[in-house]
Amino acid sequence: MTTFYTVISWLSVFGYWLLIAGVTLRILMKRRAVPSAMAWLLVIYILPLVGIIAYLSFGELHLGKRRAERAKAMWPSTARWLSELKDCQHIFASSNSEVATPLFQLCERRQGISGVKGNQLQLLTTTDDTLKALVRDIELARHNIEMVFYIWQPGGLVDQVAESLMAAARRGVHCRLMLDSAGSQQFFRTPYPAMMRNAGIEVVEALKVNVFRVFLRRMDLRQHRKVVLIDNYVAYTGSMNMVDPRFFKQDAGVGQWIDMMARMEGPVATTIGIVYACDWEIETGKRILPPPPDTHIMPFEEESGHTIQVIASGPGFPEEMIHQALLTAVYAARKQLIMTTPYLVPSDDLLHAICTAAQRGVDVSIIVPRDNDSMMVRWASRAFFSELLDAGVKIYQFEGGLLHSKSVLVDGQLSLVGTVNLDMRSLWLNFEITLVIDDDGFGADLAQVQDDYIARSVLLDGEQWNKRPLWHRVTERLFYFFSPFL
């Protein structure tokens, strides 16, 4: 009997170290950023059991077998659709401004299509304006309405959107609503899903959170897009979830959320439609490819319209596309770079690009909220402040609420607006969407909004920052260690 227990003990020890060695080899064989690999290895060797479980749950990007098969199956039809779209040559811009050319070239090479011209574009900077405009567009819808949001929380003007959407479905408009399971978990506990389905709306809970499938799919892979598509001609996207800030997270102590959305009319809506169609098929298995765009662009539309490129990221989309786009935009800056983000936990490459821009004379400003709804992100963000300040970057801390807008403005000409935070999750993991606009008129509108943010912010003083308590520095470095996981 003693021999039996001895053998079991040795086998357990051998199995334990074999498991650690196997996971270590897996981490080393995967091509990932060095800080991320080192962080995972340290966690696994300091807390082996916790580290291994965490890595198997969150360490690698995988959709799950069923969704991966759907993503693979949809690609041939999507490729044919894109090929047919490319035949509509006159909706695509043939040239771009000097500062925008590298980014538009990258997008064309990696995504297969150029920027789409002849679009009307409006920047909406208040929740009231956005939701009221959305209700009006829903009431005018004739054929189809597609929506995807990370968070939908009933209350306030959001209920008017829900009522108008149900009314549209009842009068025969085909309505689809896809909401992230984790972000909208409160919504799925309300009567609204049943009410909407009874009205004829297809409601889908995307990327369902299921503890029993934690090793089969990454639970922190989220559907983070915010998109509305109406009649394949009107589209919205930006940072705003479907929430009324007067009723959302009032007990978080960070004030009301501040967002921006872009409303578009024109052929670019079709490219947003193909992104939605891919998401819908991955989640439901149903194919809903959008019709071709209205390719007849009037001369006045071409003259006054905006050139827009849509960048989508996530499993099934070009790998690291958002990250590459941001790097390209930062390196293209010659005079000024302004960035707004609620969560500042950049990759090493992006951090160095921003610092290098400031060091070569570009006027670089980053606007972040003073208070944040995530304690980990708040402390991890501060770990980057010293390096940014030393490089000459101006950091503004917004005091008028939780600044949730995500925007980049380069030299007053090239604008990026969308759902992407400057953190690891947005850059490499989640389903995200960003608009790239090559237009100094829209750039002036965005600059005006960013100037308003700056006016409601406090400029971080480098000397004062260096006098912060030692325990602040220690806490920042502790959370910085976990930044590859955030």
Swiss-Prot record:
SUPFAM superfamilies noted in UniProt: Phospholipase D/nuclease
Matches recorded under InterPro entries: Cardiolipin_synthase, CL_synthase_A, CLS_N, PLD-like_dom, PLipase_D/transphosphatidylase
Membrane-spanning residues: 3-23, 38-58
EC number: 2.7.8.-
Pfam families: PLDc_2, PLDc_N
UniProt entry keywords in alphabetical sequence: Cell inner membrane, Cell membrane, Lipid biosynthesis, Lipid metabolism, Membrane, Phospholipid biosynthesis, Phospholipid metabolism, Repeat, Transferase, Transmembrane, Transmembrane helix
GO molecular function term, any single one: cardiolipin synthase activity
GO BP, one annotated term: cardiolipin biosynthetic process
Active site: H224, K226, D231, H404, K406, D411
Topological type in the membrane: Multi-pass membrane protein
CDD domains: PLDc_EcCLS_like_1 (cd09152), PLDc_EcCLS_like_2 (cd09158)
Function text: Catalyzes the reversible phosphatidyl group transfer from one phosphatidylglycerol molecule to another to form cardiolipin (CL) (diphosphatidylglycerol) and glycerol.
Protein name, per record: Cardiolipin synthase A
